[in-house]
Every structure is written in structure tokens, then in C-alpha cells.
Amino acid sequence: MSEFRQMRRKRQQLSNEESIAILEKATAGTLALLGDEGYPYAVPISYVYHDGKLYFHSALAGHKVDAIRKCDKASFCVVEQDDVQPKKYTTFFRSVIAFGRIHIIEDEQEKLETARMLGNRYNPNDDESLQKEIESGFSRMLMIRFDIEYLTGKEAIELVRMRNAKSVNA
């Protein structure tokens, strides 16, 4: 058996390119770690995706940091779309889950570069303000790198059917 399960409903699986596009577009997701006493610990968090990796920032201490130091395996979920369809008792969803290894960045240069990358994701074109923000908080923050080992995306079967109908009618 491979380390990662294959999706059961293959027709609903998004391509790798579509999954990456969701990661590039979204601004937040849920990071899942192995928490205290073996309980899952899932925390909503902002991020930036770059070159097959996810980057996060954090305070120097806390539940998330303790969990990362204890176990480097993690998953990260982003829900791009979740449109409730009341009469159908379902939602039209599109989501992505990344599995991989998570690390606290120790190298100061890499930490600085990733802090800039994250800052530019949320406030582009304001380098002066970003530099001041980084300088004022750099010693009190961690930068975290999530190396994606497996990425899978899925959408509601209704969205698959709509897409197929459009391509037939095109």
C-alpha cells in the first residue's frame, strides 16, 4: 500500500493543476497536526503557497509549535467553494488537502525571505511598510515551511456534471 490513499471517487478528483490553483488563490486553510495526548489539533491559519510548499507564521510558543516539534507530519485543507443547495440537501464544494512534513525554519535568511513572501501575499506593493513590520516583530515570530508530499483536490459531483455538460455544448 502506498503511503497515501487514492481517492475513491475518481470522477470528482481535481487535477494537480486545479488543486495548485486553489492553493494559489485562497488565503486561509486549516492546518491539522498531532496535538496533546494524541488528539488531532486543527487550527485555521493564513498562508502563502510557493513552489510546492506552504508557508505560515506563528508566535514563538503555543499548541501549534509544540505539535510541530513533536511530530512533523501534517495536513492542510482549503475549502475554495461551499455553496449550500438546500433543495438538494448538499453543497457544491471544491476543496484541496495537502499532506506533508512541516518544519520550523531555522535559517535566518530563509525566515526573512518567507516572511516577506507571506507579507507580500496579503499586502502587495508596500515594501516599506512590510519591512518595518518584519523588523518590529522578527525576533518574536517563527516562520514555518510545509513541504507538500501529496496533494489531492475534490469537487461535488454536481460541479463535475455541470462542467461536462458545458464541454459537450461548447
Predicted regions and their residues:
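Broad gene-expression machinery/nucleic-acid interaction feature
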Residues: A28, A42-P44, K73, F93, ...
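Structural motif corresponding to alpha-helix initiation and N-cap regions
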Residues: N16, A61-G62
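Helix-adjacent hinge/juxtasegments
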Residues: H57, H63-F93
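Short, basic/aromatic recognition patches
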Residues: S2-T30
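A generic structural signal for nonpolar/aromatic side chains embedded in well-ordered alpha-helices
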Residues: L23, A67-I68, L118
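Charged, gly/pro-rich active-site loop segments
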Residues: S2-R11, D83-A170
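Short beta-strand segments
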Residues: A26-L60, F76-C77
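Beta-strand-connecting loop/turn residues
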Residues: G52-K53, D72, E149
